[in-house]
Each structure stands twice: as structure tokens, then as C-alpha cells.
Amino acid sequence: KDGYLVGNDGCKYSCNTYPK
């Protein structure tokens, strides 16, 4: 996933750099 999903889908920051 791409974009900023804080708390969603297990992403802490941008899913690009920090995937679940």
C-alpha cells in the first residue's frame, strides 16, 4: 500500500517506507 496510513493496515508512517 502507498500513502500515510497511521494505525490503519498496521502502518506506522508511510506504508512506502514502513509496511505492516
From Swiss-Prot:
Q: Which UniProt keywords apply?
A: Amidation, Disulfide bond, Ion channel impairing toxin, Neurotoxin, Secreted, Toxin, Voltage-gated sodium channel impairing toxin
Location in the cell: Secreted
Q: In which tissues is it expressed?
A: Expressed by the venom gland.
* Domain (LCN-type CS-alpha/beta): residue spans on this chain: 1-20
Alphabetically, the GO molecular function entries are: ion channel inhibitor activity; sodium channel regulator activity; toxin activity
Main site of residence? Answer: secreted
User: How is this protein annotated for GO cellular component?
Assistant: extracellular region
User: Which comment does the entry carry about domains?
Assistant: Has the structural arrangement of an alpha-helix connected to antiparallel beta-sheets by disulfide bonds (CS-alpha/beta).
Q: What does this protein do?
A: Beta toxins bind voltage-independently at site-4 of sodium channels (Nav) and shift the voltage of activation toward more negative potentials thereby affecting sodium channel activation and promoting spontaneous and repetitive firing.
Q: Which family does it belong to?
A: Belongs to the long (4 C-C) scorpion toxin superfamily. Sodium channel inhibitor family. Beta subfamily.
For this entry, the protein name equals Toxin TpF21-Cocle
Its lineage opens with: Eukaryota, Metazoa, Ecdysozoa, Arthropoda, Chelicerata
